[in-house]
């Protein structure tokens, strides 16, 4: 399980497919 830290930090990662950055 990986928390969407990148999503919380920057919405741009949503387009990249979170929680991966």
Curated annotation (Swiss-Prot):
Coiled coil: none annotated. Tubers. It is found in: Vacuole. Keywords: Protease inhibitor, Serine protease inhibitor, Vacuole. GO terms for molecular function: serine-type endopeptidase inhibitor activity. Has a single chain structure. Belongs to the protease inhibitor I3 (leguminous Kunitz-type inhibitor) family. Inhibits trypsin and chymotrypsin (serine proteases). Does not inhibit elastase, subtilisin, cathepsin L nor papain (serine and cysteine proteases). Protects the plant by inhibiting proteases of invading organisms, decreasing both hyphal growth and zoospores germination of Phytophthora infestans. GO terms for cellular component: vacuole. Induction: By infection with Phytophthora infestans. This is Serine protease inhibitor 3. The keyword Methyltransferase does not apply. Its main location: other.
């Amino acid at each position: 399980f990986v928390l969407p830290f990148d999503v919380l930090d920057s919405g741009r990662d949503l387009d990249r497919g979170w929680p991966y950055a």
